[in-house]
UniProtKB/Swiss-Prot annotation:
Organism: Bos taurus
Gene from which the chain derives: SPTSSA
Subunit structure as annotated in this protein's UniProt entry: Component of the serine palmitoyltransferase (SPT) complex, which is composed of SPTLC1, SPTLC2 or SPTLC3 and SPTSSA or SPTSSB. The heterodimer consisting of SPTLC1 and SPTLC2/SPTLC3 forms the catalytic core of the enzyme, while SPTSSA or SPTSSB subunits determine substrate specificity. SPT also interacts with ORMDL proteins, especially ORMDL3, which negatively regulate SPT activity in the presence of ceramides. Interacts with MBOAT7; the interaction plays a role in MBOAT7 localization to mitochondria-associated membranes.
Primary localization class, coarse: endoplasmic reticulum
Membrane topology reported for the UniProt record: Multi-pass membrane protein
Highest taxon, organism lineage: Eukaryota
Lumenal side: 27-31
Protein name as annotated: Serine palmitoyltransferase small subunit A
GO molecular function: serine C-palmitoyltransferase activity
Family per record: Belongs to the SPTSS family. SPTSSA subfamily.
Lineage of source species: Eukaryota, Metazoa, Chordata, Craniata, Vertebrata
Function per UniProt: Component of the serine palmitoyltransferase multisubunit enzyme (SPT) that catalyzes the initial and rate-limiting step in sphingolipid biosynthesis by condensing L-serine and activated acyl-CoA (most commonly palmitoyl-CoA) to form long-chain bases. The SPT complex is composed of SPTLC1, SPTLC2 or SPTLC3 and SPTSSA or SPTSSB. Within this complex, the heterodimer consisting of SPTLC1 and SPTLC2/SPTLC3 forms the catalytic core. Within the SPT complex, SPTSSA stimulates the catalytic activity and plays a role in substrate specificity, which depends upon the overall complex composition.
UniProt site (Within the serine palmitoyltransferase (SPT) complex, defines the length of the acyl chain-binding pocket, determining the acyl-CoA substrate preference): 25
PANTHER family: SERINE PALMITOYLTRANSFERASE SMALL SUBUNIT A (PTHR47084:SF1)
GO CC terms, sorted: endoplasmic reticulum; endoplasmic reticulum membrane; serine palmitoyltransferase complex
């Protein structure tokens, strides 16, 4: 019962995603290309934030002399 409800909820979120991004008008292969590009861009942004954010935070803390 809970699995069916979760599946219905995820289907609703996916439907909303298709409507908001206007992907419902595209063919399946175009939708796949768009989603692949979106996932890769978000993945690269998260990776870049993970790699470089600690360096920037430490530079800010040193600049404001919070950390010596």
């Amino acid at each position: 019962m809970a699995l069916a409800r979760a599946w219905k909820q995820m289907s609703w979120f996916y439907y909303q995603y298709l409507l908001v991004t206007a992907l419902y008008m595209l063919e399946p292969w175009e939708r796949t290309v768009f989603n692949s590009m979106l996932v890769s861009i978000v993945g690269m942004a998260l990776y870049t934030g993970y790699v470089f954010m600690p360096q920037h935070i430490m530079a800010i803390l040193h600049y404001f002399e919070i950390v010596q």
